[in-house]
């Protein structure tokens, strides 16, 4: 039985985002040579702003292969640029007009929360490899993460820009590879990428100051591990803890999923229903982060048994937090959640 108490987490205040302060050869804020019309087209399709490193990395890939800039890392690293990069590549213009693509679902993998947007995949369809995370639709992404979509919901932060994410992956591959030809190929890409990133002033560290500043504002890690950052004021209004630990909530979910009958499953849902009542109380007192956490955990657990509850909790939480685009993405995702055929431009 779920305990009857719940509380706000102490010390979960929200402060301003810290800007990166590193010495660079060249300002990283210089704009990539991508036309304003093309930028607007990308942002209009997704209703999101993209960071400058997104465009700089595209120009880097164009230098590697001007004819197929989405694929120059495919042969060497198995990486392919997708989703918003498809717009830069003009792939959306090749789509048959008989069907209208849903950009909320384009390359949205099974475990991708609304805060995340796929930008790179690995080995064709095997993984959401690079995903950028923003805590609110009106903010720029804080980091690039890695998720093995066929394994679980865990997301591992890998630098605060695309160059860092690919560089760190390259370093890992260089340690694993034994073939001399591949080693030289990796080193060649690494040298070019490192030089470009340094010229533009991008950090190649796995965990930067900007990421550490976000970590301080995370109120709960959630099942995917990278945490949630709902607005929390100086009086700690905005979030209160769930009455169950992550481990206990996972056990409750496991019991529900493995129930031998519908009757047993309904009984096993009792703790979840009680927590939903707590969420209602929390929402009444502006602690919207509680419903966001419970909904996200149930979404991340992955079972279709939790889709209905997640569909009640998450869109409401996002709307209360004025993150309406995330509510829309979540509704679309839960209505069309799948593990394959996620390329909206596929024939």
Curated annotation (Swiss-Prot):
Keywords: Acetylation. It comes from Homo sapiens. It holds the Pfam family HPF1. PANTHER family: HISTONE PARYLATION FACTOR 1, HISTONE PARYLATION FACTOR 1-LIKE-RELATED. GO terms for molecular function: histone binding; poly-ADP-D-ribose binding. This is Putative histone PARylation factor 1-like. The modification N-acetylmethionine is found at residue 1. One of its GO terms (biological process) is DNA repair-dependent chromatin remodeling.
């Amino acid at each position: 039985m779920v305990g009857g108490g719940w509380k706000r987490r102490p010390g979960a205040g929200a402060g301003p985002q810290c800007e990166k302060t590193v010495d660079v050869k060249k300002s990283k804020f210089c704009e990539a040579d991508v036309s304003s019309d093309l930028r607007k087209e990308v942002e209009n399709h997704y209703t999101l702003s993209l960071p400058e490193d997104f465009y700089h990395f595209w120009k880097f890939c164009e230098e590697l292969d001007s004819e197929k800039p989405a694929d120059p890392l495919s042969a060497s690293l198995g990486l392919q640029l997708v989703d918003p990069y498809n717009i830069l590549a003009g792939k959306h213009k090749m789509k048959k007009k008989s069907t209208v693509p849903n950009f909320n679902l384009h390359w949205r993998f099974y475990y991708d929360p609304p805060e995340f947007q796929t930008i790179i995949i690995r080995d064709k369809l095997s993984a959401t490899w690079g995903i950028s995370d923003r805590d609110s639709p009106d903010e720029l992404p804080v980091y690039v993460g890695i998720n093995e979509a066929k394994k679980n919901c865990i997301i591992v932060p890998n630098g605060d820009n695309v160059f860092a994410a690919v560089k760190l992956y390259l370093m890992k591959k260089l340690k694993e590879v034994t073939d001399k030809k591949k080693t030289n190929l990796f080193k060649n890409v690494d040298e070019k990428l490192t030089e470009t990133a340094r010229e533009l002033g991008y950090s190649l560290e796995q965990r930067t100051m900007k990421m550490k500043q976000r970590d301080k504002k995370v109120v709960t890690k959630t099942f995917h591990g990278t945490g949630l950052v709902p607005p929390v004021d100086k009086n700690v209004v905005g979030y209160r803890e769930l009455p169950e630990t992550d481990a206990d909530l996972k056990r409750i979910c496991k019991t529900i999923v493995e129930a031998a009958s519908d009757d047993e499953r309904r009984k096993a849902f009792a703790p979840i229903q009680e927590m939903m009542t707590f969420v209602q109380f929390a929402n009444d007192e502006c602690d919207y982060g509680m419903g966001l956490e419970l909904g996200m955990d149930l979404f991340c657990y992955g079972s279709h048994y939790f889709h209905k509850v997640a569909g009640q909790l998450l869109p409401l939480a996002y709307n209360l937090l004025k993150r309406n685009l995330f509510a829309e993405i979540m509704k679309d995702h839960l209505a069309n959640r799948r593990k394959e055929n996620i390329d909206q431009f596929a024939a």
